[in-house]
């Protein structure tokens, strides 16, 4: 028997295997043939395939004719002095919050430009979220692994996303620094890989904490282990984002340079009580309007505030947004 017979037998076995799978909802050989035959290799398909082979789908999907249709003229503008770019990161919430403060400082001191370090705030955001996870694991160590809260914790050990409560909680505790004091890095602009690696390490730590608690570790021992684990997370953050400054020298244009800590800098130039002077407004049609809602354990700091918002109709939010823009307060 030649190789041809061997290949035929293998093909028959493959088809038989596919047929067996079909009995359990799989793709049979007959079904696979129908699927293959349904594809018609048209000249247009060939052109699309060649284009997709070397070009991003997002680039190809852009309608070039629409690029000139955007009207960039506005009746009112906020004194932002340029844009800020979150790059390929999930820090939209942080950029938005810092832009509110940025416009206030530009207007207050008549600055030509100003930008706060998003990287500085993000560093402590990730460290605080790591602690939030680990402490959550300690708090639920007496519950089974299939408990809904435990399951949720291990599914969401760390993220780069957030909302304004996180901005206020991080700044309240750690202050602010100018962007020049802690610049962006590749990982701060591309947060996905860094956050996923730290998340994997946190899951490992979470299992270790649960095991320690199950074998009788006292609260003080668990606290010690958690602190050591956060030391590892801190090192990972330093390697990817850089180490946050504790002091720096800065001055307003034409002013005398002074040394600041991040907290003293924030208090001197802004000093706004973000925790008590601001409230999140949201439009959630699935819940009753004109009420305040709080999402449990959805926060950035263990000792911080939960995601809390006032639910308003979209018409009310539009009016407030317009008034804010006109007042240049964002």
Segments from the language model and where they lie:
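Structured alpha-helical subdomains that flank or immediately precede key functional sites
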Residues: 22-88, 94-330
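Solvent-exposed, well-ordered amphipathic alpha-helical segments
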Residues: 8, 21-22
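N-terminal signal peptide c-region/cleavage motif recognized by signal peptidases
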Residues: 15-17
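Short, small-residue-biased leader/transition segments that mark boundaries at the very start
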Residues: 1-7
């Amino acid at each position: 028997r030649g190789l041809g017979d061997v290949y035929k037998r293998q093909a028959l076995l493959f088809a038989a295997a596919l047929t067996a799978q079909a009995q359990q909802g799989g793709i049979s050989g007959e079904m696979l043939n129908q699927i293959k035959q349904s594809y018609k290799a048209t000249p247009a398909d060939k052109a699309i395939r060649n284009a997709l082979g070397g070009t991003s789908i997002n680039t190809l999907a852009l309608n070039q004719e629409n690029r000139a249709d955007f009207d960039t003229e506005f009746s009112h503008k906020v004194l932002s002095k340029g844009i800020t770019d979150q790059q390929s990161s999930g820090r939209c919430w942080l950029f938005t919050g810092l832009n509110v403060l940025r416009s206030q400082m530009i207007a207050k001191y008549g600055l030509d430009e100003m930008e706060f370090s998003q990287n500085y705030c993000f560093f402590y955001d990730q460290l605080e979220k790591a602690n939030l996870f680990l402490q959550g694991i300690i708090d639920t160590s007496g519950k089974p692994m299939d408990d809904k809260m435990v399951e949720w914790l291990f599914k969401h050990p760390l993220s780069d996303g957030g909302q304004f409560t996180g901005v206020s909680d991080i700044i309240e505790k750690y202050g602010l620094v100018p962007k020049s004091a802690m610049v962006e890095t590749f990982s701060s602009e591309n947060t996905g890989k860094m956050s996923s690696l730290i998340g994997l390490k946190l899951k490992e730590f979470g299992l270790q904490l649960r095991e320690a608690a199950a074998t009788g570790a006292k609260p003080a021992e668990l606290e010690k282990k958690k602190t050591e684990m956060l030391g590892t997370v801190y090192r990972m953050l330093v390697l990817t984002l850089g180490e946050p400054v504790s002091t720096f020298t800065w001055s307003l244009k034409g002013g005398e340079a002074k040394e600041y800590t991040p907290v003293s800098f924030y208090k001197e130039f802004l000093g706004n009580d973000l925790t008590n002077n601001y409230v999140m407004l949201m439009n959630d049609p699935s819940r009753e309007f004109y009420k305040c809602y709080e999402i449990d354990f959805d926060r950035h700091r263990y000792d911080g505030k939960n995601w809390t918002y006032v639910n308003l109709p979209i018409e009310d939010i539009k009016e407030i947004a317009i008034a804010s823009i006109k007042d240049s307060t964002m």
